[in-house]
Design a protein with these regions (language model features):
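Surface-exposed acidic/polar loop and edge beta-strand patches at domain peripheries
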Residues: 20-205, 209, 213-219, 223-297
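Bacterial Sec-dependent N-terminal signal peptides
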Residues: 1-29
Length: 297
């Protein structure tokens, strides 16, 4: 896969499902857990909701300008198919905003750090860094983003923001985000695989960029910001996260993954196999892993 320039990130989300035929139904007939249900629900919350559609009429991706350019959810099998992203209906229905962070959900969402430390953008200068004083910047929590361009399979959004960090500096930032629905052919080309017949696929890439709008450089004195991408999916007993990694010939490529953030991940929940890491993500165990740059693909 092609490399991305500095301050850009690219994410490829994939989901597969067996083909099945479904009759078209009115939106209010879809069951909770289906893509059709979430599409109907989100249209009521964001009148400017954007739906990217593939040429097979089954792959769709929901993007919300109102809710911080989130990819809320997607499907590989049309309205009757499973809604793959986690949509927090209770929070979206609430009339009372959370002063710390509004957990709307989202299959792919733009986030910024650092959350804590001397350059935190989540704490006011001089305030003790405890949860009661922790507040998410509004630009990535409750404010809408601007739509720059919309095509049938891609959308570009942007947001200008000013962030106060723990040093008392105001960091002026322009954030840009492009989301593109990929065809089956593009998936095969990017991943160098042959998709089996009888399989539906939904895949998209996101490219995310931040630009310094200050009249000074960000450095070890002023502080800086970093991009995070946070992804929330609906778990299942068979759900797994697949992470390709480099099988290096170097003498010291480093361990494949750091797996002890919340205690070591049990061996029955993680497996390494010929350059691919498999992590069980059934929602029944909290875990976290990381890879160094020499291992990541």
């Amino acid at each position: 896969m092609k490399g991305i320039t500095v301050l850009l990130t690219a994410i490829l989300m994939l989901a597969f499902s067996r083909c099945n035929n479904s009759k078209k139904k009115s939106m209010n007939e879809y069951e909770k857990g289906t893509y059709g249900y979430d599409l109907n629900f989100l249209k009521e919350k964001d009148k400017g909701l954007i739906v990217l559609k593939g040429d097979n009429e089954k792959a769709e991706v929901i993007v919300s300008p109102k809710y911080q350019a989130k990819v809320f959810t997607s499907t590989s099998n049309g309205p009757d198919g499973t809604s793959l992203g986690f949509v927090n209906h209770d929070v979206l229905n609430s009339d009372v905003p959370d002063e710390h962070m509004n957990g709307y959900g989202g299959e792919n969402r733009f986030w910024l750090g650092p959350e804590g430390g001397q350059f935190s953008i989540f704490f006011e200068r001089g305030r003790e860094q405890v949860f009661n004083n922790w507040h998410t910047p509004k630009a990535i929590d409750v404010e809408p983003w601007d739509v720059k361009e919309v095509l049938s399979t891609e959308v570009s959004l942007a947001k200008d923001m000013e962030l106060n960090n723990y040093q008392g500096n105001i960091l002026k930032i322009s954030a840009d985000r492009k989301i593109k629905l990929l065809s089956s052919g593009q998936v095969e080309q990017e991943l160098e695989v042959q998709l089996p017949e009888g399989i539906n696929v939904v895949a998209y890439s996101t490219v995310n960029k931040i630009t310094n709008l200050n009249d000074f450089q960000w450095d070890e004195k002023t502080g800086t910001v970093c991009i995070w991408m946070l992804d929330m999916f609906n778990p299942s007993d068979s759900a797994a996260t697949i992470v390709p990694y480099n099988v290096s010939d170097e003498k010291e490529p480093g361990i494949i993954a750091t797996t002890g953030y919340f205690g070591e991940i049990p061996s029955d929940r993680i497996r390494y196999e010929s350059g691919i890491l498999f992590l069980k993500t059934d929602g029944k165990y909290r875990s976290k892993l990381g890879m160094n740059a020499r291992r990541t693909k």
